[in-house]
């Protein structure tokens, strides 16, 4: 069963910042591919959110081609997944959400 996915404002800002970074420092194509990779990962999470708990109550799904982790939690009773943050793995892990 697919879960409803809600993306937090913080995660939206993370996505926007990452997109702009790739667009400015690589190319529009790389930035667009980043968004495609993110969407594929969201689909995987939506279909099966039972990833290992990585940090507090958050689970994490790495993107395939980009050094980012999608931190999320889910409510099994309500069938809702909350995307909390999209964290760049090259940053300090002490700053995890």
List where the protein language model places each region.
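Enriched for short, Lys/Arg-rich terminal
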Residues: 73-97
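Basic, Lys/Arg-enriched alpha-helical interface segments
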Residues: 1-57
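Basic/aromatic recognition patch in beta-strand/loop cores that engages polyanionic ligands
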Residues: 50-78
């Amino acid at each position: 069963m697919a879960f409803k996915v809600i993306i937090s404002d913080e995660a939206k800002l993370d996505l926007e910042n990452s997109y702009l970074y790739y667009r400015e420092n690589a190319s529009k194509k790389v930035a667009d591919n980043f968004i495609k990779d993110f969407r594929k990962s969201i689909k995987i999470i939506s279909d099966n959110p039972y990833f290992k708990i990585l940090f507090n109550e958050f689970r994490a799904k790495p993107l395939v081609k980009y050094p980012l982790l999608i931190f999320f939690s889910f409510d099994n009773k309500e069938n809702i997944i909350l995307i909390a943050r999209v964290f760049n793995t090259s940053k300090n892990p002490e700053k995890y959400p």
